[in-house]
Each structure stands twice: as structure tokens, then as C-alpha cells.
Amino acid sequence: MNKIRKTFQYGKHEVTFETGEMARQATGAVVVRMGDTVLLVSVVAKKEAEEGRDFFPLTINYQEKTYAAGKIPGGYFKREGRPTEKETLTSRLIDRPLRPLFPKGFTNEVQVIATVLSVDSKVPTDIPAILGASAAIGLSGIPFNGSLGAARVGYRGGEYLLNPSLDELKDSALDLVVAGTRDAVLMVESEAQELPESVMLGAVLHGHQAMQVAIQAIAEFIQEAGGAKWEWEPPTVNTALEKWVVEKSEAPLKKAYQIQEKTARQAQIQAIRDQLLADRAAEREGEENAVNEHELAVIFHELERRIVREQILTGQPRIDGRDSKTVRPITVKVGVLPRSHGSALFTRGETQALVVTTLGTERDAQSIDDLDGDRQEEFIFHYNFPPFCVGEVGFMSGPKRREIGHGRLAKRAVVPVVPTLDKFPYVIRVVSEILESNGSSSMASVCGSSLALMDAGVPTKAPVAGIAMGLIKENDKYAVLSDILGDEDHLGDMDFKVAGTSNGVTALQMDIKIEGITKEIMEQALDQAKEGRLHILSIMNKVLDKPRSQVSDLAPQYVTMKINPEKIRDVIGKGGVVIREITEATNCAIDISDDGTIKIAAHTTEEGEAAKRRIEELTAEVELGKVYEGTVVKITDFGAFVQILPNTQGLVHISQIAQERVENVRDYLEEGQVIRVKVIEIDRQGRVRLSMKQID
């Protein structure tokens, strides 16, 4: 294969695609370079699909190699291990816009691997990873509907920033990633500082417009490489079987989709499906391959999809009887767990989240070591989705990709209102336990986490709520749905999640399965989402509208103090012996910063104050003219040395012991004796002179 190279300007970065030199046995492979960030993106697809498979087995693996940043992995094995949270999230970010571009009915196994070979701190890796995946799939010849582009958009000083660096993002009120084709936006992932809906929509459109140069470059690159397209035809529809399924199942399915309770509805649909299989087997008894269950299931699912969509587009009530704008009934409880620092139970229809906030010390912060550098995460968010929440039996293991993704979305939504460590001295962990799920569990987690944080006394800027929107679109007819059910998400054309305060949006996530989503439709979805969000906030605020005035008595009690940085060594002691003795004696955790700031975390206020007193004694400065009570530690011919502070001794000269003349110091003093002395001089070297006779 000849080496092909394509270079184009993308904002302030030069982007280069290369193929034909690396990974030549892959179905398609591209080396993409953006600044000094370099990735190898490969795609391999199996030529034959597994018979009877009713899903598309697409696997995306994004992996970071530490050598890309000139680092050696930590740990005993000194090699990369299981995927980090960032790798999992980036894999999902690549997957979401790619998946809808594969044709319906294509079930061949496809694996995309994006490997970071070199990293530039000014160029985040996710955008070149998406561009590289699009180019590699295009080169492979796999059935794929169009080139995919992606852009990151920031917002600062009223202007949009295209593909900002990590440093620029620190000052940006927005971090938004948008991906799409020439004509359609397919995916949005964002975090914002309470921005108006108009700014969010403008960012999406700005990014989509900017990515056109990348889409064009990818198309030209693929054309220049000239790879052969796969010969693939979508599976033919058995029209006779389709007609038979419609005749048998349409009427009972329409009735089933009027059952509002999820479990009962699912049971009825399963009964209809089972009866359909039994009827088909009875009619074709004795025939070879009488029942093709896979073919029957595909047709049955399409019938379900058509029934639900027609119902909504013709203005009929939704599955659970609501109109397009109504939010399901909401109940809110806070302080539901007696020994937690903060808790909330948020229920919306058949979706329920128990969210718990725990406050810890700086030592509880999560250490992150990735290509972006070492850092500490002071706000931790975990989302758990056990199988019982959907009435299923399942294997309990570590968090799956979906749980990590939903947890990150909920975290993005509340981070803008959570105080930083310098304003609130606690490390915060929020855990959302999904107890029931029928759509929008991540947004229930947002609402519950806002309540749990306030219940714990965390001084958040404002309450946050989230809502999931959906879309049903056929030709020019469409309906935007508020607070979608799981079935509406599965059978609809868009999943559009918006979270924010009453002032603006803090997180926006969008996944679109079709083309033709116009600016007007997105505007309507955002406006309708705002209406729903404010409604949810009004219900939440009736229960708890602001943070508790103080943290729970069960949380660590913080005492903060400041000392002279030169005294830090006195507090720590040789080999840490002094600070260890204080922590053991007072049962406290003590953190000391280089600037002399000391944070004492105690189980009770009394323990914290005891530790503070010990430190004050260790670091106290000797005051001229002040009287101290000290212990005689050494006697000499010319006087006595007295310890007046834990790390400070002074000399009582023989002439300062008594009013009369003293011939022998030992006639007046002995070692270990406690006496009162006055500081009469501190010389330039810090030496202290004391007097007994000058005390009034």
C-alpha cells in the first residue's frame, strides 16, 4: 500500500492524516496528528456476520500509553492496566456519533482501537480520536453513511473558542464537544457555568459549522486512498411474514401500549410475543425451519416502534397517558439515612434514585495520574445501576461503561455549583444508587445529588435539576417529549438531557439517531427542557431550597489555623514524631500546607480544639515583657536554662534570680522545678533572657 498523507488547517491547529505505513494488516488504519498529539486509529471488521444476530457488535477501545507523555507507569508491574475512567469515557464519546452512521441491518463485528502515541498538553486527545476513527472506517470500505467530524467549543468573554487548549478551558465558561456529519449534528457532550440556552445552542451550531473543514478533508483523504467498498446488501424483509405479524399482533400491541405501569406492560408485550411464536409454530408444524425467531423478533420490534411513534405523532396520549410536555409525578425526601452526612430520595414516576453525600478530609481526595499530569480530585461522583432496579437478575461486578458515563454526566451537571476546596475544606463524595429505572436515571441522580449536597450542608451556589427530552420525527411531522420513559428513549430519534439551575444550563448531552434535526427543533427542545427543569426545581425547593446552615455532626469537624511557615518543622518534629504524637493523643487528622495553613479534622469540636492548642503551644512566639511559667531544664554556674515554650528555652542569669546577691544557683533552683519568669530581652540571634526578680 502506498503512503497517503493529507494535511489541513483546523482552527489554530494543523491536522495531518497518514495511512499506508503503520498497522497495514488492519481493515483500515490512520495516524492522526493535531499539534504534537498523535494517535493511531485502527478498525477491523469481520467479513461474515453471525447468523441470527439482532444487534450491531461495535466495540470502541480508546487507550493511552504513558510513553506518550514521557512517563513510566506506576505500580509494581510498570505497565498500563485496565482502562481508566478517562479512557472509558473517551471510548463512549467516540462510539456515540459513530454508531448511528452504520446502516440498519449491518451486524458484522467491528472493532475500533484508538491508541495515543504522543500527547500535547495544548491539544486534548478526544477530538483527533473521533476524526481518526471516522477516517479509518472510511478507508476500510465498511458500510458507513458519511464522514464524521468533531469539534470542541469553549466560551469566554462572549466569544466562542474553537478547540481550546486545556489551559484555555480553565478560564472558559463552557466545555462542549459536538460531532456530526455534513448535514446533521449527531452528538453533544458539555459542561457549562449556568449559561443561557441560546449560548448553548449557538455553541453547537458554531462547532458544527467549524467541523465542515475536517469533514471535507476526511472525504478527500478517503477518496485519494481509493480503498474498495464492501459489497453488502441490507437483509430483505419478508413481506409475507410482516403482513402476518401485523394482522396477528397490531391490535393487541396497541392495547398493551395503553398499560401505564411498566412491569405490567412489559409482561403483556412478552405474552403477545410468545403467543405469536406459538401461532407461527402451529401453522408451520412439520415444516423445516418453521419458525425463524430472529426474523420474527425484528418485525415485531418494528411494529412496536411504529405503534408508539404513530400514537404520539397523531396527538394521542403517550404510553403512560401524559401529553408531550408533562413531567411525571415527583416525590422528594431528604435526610432519609440516619448516619450519613447528607441523603435524598428522589422519585420521578418509575425512576428512583437514593443519593448520599459523604464529607471527608483532603486525604480522601482521589489521586489521578494520567497523560494530563498528576492531580487530586476533591469532588467524587459514583453512579450505580444494580440489576434489581429494572426487575432483572444480573451479575454484580465493578462499574460498567454505562455507569461510568452516567456518573460523569451527573457530575458535570453539579460541579459548577459545588464550592472549591479553598472555600469549603471538605473532600466530597456523592453516590447515586438507582433503585428503580424507567428512563432518565442520570437526571434523577442530578436532582438527588443537589438535594443530598444541600442536606449535608455543602454551600452550593444554587439547586440543580435535570430532565431528559426525546423526539419522534417522521418526515415533516415531529413531537418533542419531556421526561421520556425508557421505551420512548429506545423507540425515539433523540436523547437530549439538559441539567441546570434556575439561572442557566450546567450540562447538556445529546444523542441523535437520524438526520434532519433542525435548529428550530433543537430550540424547541431546549425551551421545553427549561420549562420542565424549572417545574422540577419548584418541587425540590418546597422540600429544601438552600443548604443546611452547618454540616452534620457526624461529618469531620474542621479547625483551621495559620502558623509561621518557619515553625512547620517544630510541629512535624524529627521523623514526624511530634505531629504523630498530637494526632494519636487527640484522635485528629492534621494537614499542613507549605504556606503555614493547618487544617485539623476531628470527630468532635473538642478534639479539634485540643489539637489546635497543642500546635499553638508548639508554634507560639516569645513575647518581650510577658511572664511565663517554665521548667528548669539545666543549671550552670552562671545561671539556669528554663523551658518556657515546647521549643523555646531562655537563660535566667545568676544576677536575675533574686533581689539579693546569689553565690550558688543550686541554693535557689533545682532541675525540674517549675518557676515563673519574665522575658527581658530577645537578641538578634533569637536568644531569650529571662528574669525571676523582675516579676512584680
From Swiss-Prot:
GO CC annotation terms, alphabetical: cytosol
E.C. number, please?
Answer: 2.7.7.8
Which positions fall inside the KH domain? 556-615
Q: For this protein, what is any one GO molecular function term? A: 3'-5'-RNA exonuclease activity
| Keyword check for Methyltransferase | no
The entry's protein name is Polyribonucleotide nucleotidyltransferase
The signal sequence is none
Please give the cofactor(s) recorded in the UniProt entry for this protein: Mg(2+)
Could you say which residues bind Mg(2+) here?
489, 495
Gene Ontology biological-process entries:
mRNA catabolic process; RNA processing
Q: Which HAMAP family match?
A: PNPase
Q: Which reaction does it catalyse?
A: RNA(n+1) + phosphate = RNA(n) + a ribonucleoside 5'-diphosphate
Annotated ranges, domain S1 motif: 625-693
What is stated as this protein's family in its record? Answer: Belongs to the polyribonucleotide nucleotidyltransferase family.
> How does this chain assemble?
Component of the RNA degradosome, which is a multiprotein complex involved in RNA processing and mRNA degradation.
Q: Which UniProt keywords apply?
A: Cytoplasm, Magnesium, Metal-binding, Nucleotidyltransferase, RNA-binding, Transferase
Enzyme class comes to transferase
Give the UniProt subcellular location, in the record's own words. Answer: Cytoplasm
Q: State its role.
A: Involved in mRNA degradation. Catalyzes the phosphorolysis of single-stranded polyribonucleotides processively in the 3'- to 5'-direction.
| InterPro entries reported in the protein's UniProt record | ExoRNase_PH_dom1 (IPR001247), ExoRNase_PH_dom2 (IPR015847), ExoRNase_PH_dom2_sf (IPR036345), KH_dom (IPR004087), KH_dom_type_1 (IPR004088), KH_dom_type_1_sf (IPR036612), NA-bd_OB-fold (IPR012340), PNPase (IPR012162)
Pfam families xrefs: KH_1 (PF00013), PNPase (PF03726), RNase_PH (PF01138), RNase_PH_C (PF03725), S1 (PF00575)
